[in-house]
Amino acid sequence: MFYFYSEGKKLRLPIKQIIYAEILNHDLYITTNGWGTVHSRMTLAAFLEKMPDNFIRIHHSYVINTDYLMGVGYRECTVAGNVVLPVARGMQKTVEKYFM
């Protein structure tokens, strides 16, 4: 379980349902399988510290759960829900490794 605060409430979320997390304007948005998107004031680095090894940072603004990795292209990847996310140049080989 992942415990976090969102809009003044302490919430828990099954880690296996997290598809990816995005930082936008210093706010963390966590997209899930079945819960929609939830918001927190956590940093992406703090979020990643609490996640297991199958979560990787693919870009300055994104962390993905590799269990939901559906496809890899040049400097982008596709996760569940057909969502295309950017991949940093330095992370391309890492993302490809998890895809294989």
Per-segment meaning from a language model:
Residues 1-100:
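Basic, polyanion-interacting recognition surfaces, primarily
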